[in-house]
Amino acid sequence: MTVIERFLKFVSFDTTSSETSGQQPSTPNQKVLGGELVRQMLALGICDAHMDDAGYVYGTIPANCAKYLPVYGLIAHMDTSPDAPGGPIHARITEAYDGGDIVLNEAQGIVLSPRDYASLQKHVGKRLIVTDGTTLLGADDKAGVAEILSAAEKLLTSDRPHGTVKIAFTPDEEIGEGADRFDVTGFGADYAYTVDGGAIGELEYENFNAASASVEITGLSIHPGSAYGKMVNASLVAMEFAALLPALETPYFTDGYEGFFHLTGMEGEVEHAKLSYIIRDHDREKFEARKAVMEKAAQEMDRRYGKGTVTLNVRDSYFNMREKIEPCMFLVEQAKSAMLELGIMPKVQPIRGGTDGARLSFEGLPCPNLCAGGENFHGRFEYVPVEDMEKITELLATIIWNIAK
């Protein structure tokens, strides 16, 4: 199978993860896809390919040379984001892109346009895999899954020397649980790369420090005709709480190394309201300061409306892996070198998000992130260029081959 054939097969599985199921993996189709991956790995000759009870898929490509080499891992995730419908996905491949609009769904008037997504202009002349405008595509991260398996095929069918390579495919990365039950010791790699980035050339070893915050607000209901000086409307208190946070420090207004507060959910009535936030910043001190701002806002609401009005729960999710990667920057340099060898321009940049590798780096497995090729993740305008997936497959194999030189 080609990398494109693999990818189109994998996106036919709806593997949307769920934050509310309480299961592991969070949705059953992730294990269905995992079974398919194990079958393909066994067919390639990866004899120890298996899936554990939690839905993690593992396998080993043995070294084909006597030289002592560190063991490297390649990791991608099987789930897709719950932010957009995950199926049924009707993917199609365009002809060579001409730089104009791409009609995704004529009946619904859904168009992928360079006026809205300027990155399309980089791909003139390439074939693009797109959706029908009703679902996401799943290049995040099934492009990475397909590229790893296709690179594995290259390694297994070539006489070029390489060391031992470990492969892992994780569930539930999109809901922040991809590393929860990852068996770092059993995986047995010294170093690894996640293949979970965006456009070709992206190479990342910095990510957000991340936390989630739940704001529970208790109000007091009374008949509005006699509510003077008595009613505490929890929904209005929620609005006041939100107004105390910096208005220009949301995802819409921030970029690069700038952090943010992101309101991800809200519900409310008079007696009870709830706000759900995620907090992000690359700088650890600024990250801690953001959490302190949330605490101060909660205290102010209690001052205005009485102690116990607001219950704030903040939970750290993951931290910036930079401090774990900097002692082994050769991981970044050897990826850059392989890119340049293949005519890919490296783009080293911070991740405005997180990866499984961020958490794994803190568990003793340094794990920077490589491009998977897709763009516009988590939405119906997601796409991935065919030629870039083919080149990234070559990149993964080249990194492994170069380590053995």
Model-based region annotation:
Residues 67-161, 169, 189, 391:
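Active-site metal-coordination/substrate-binding segment of hydrolases
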Residues 102, 117, 126-139, 172-295, ...:
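Midchain, well-structured core segments that form catalytic/ion-binding scaffolds
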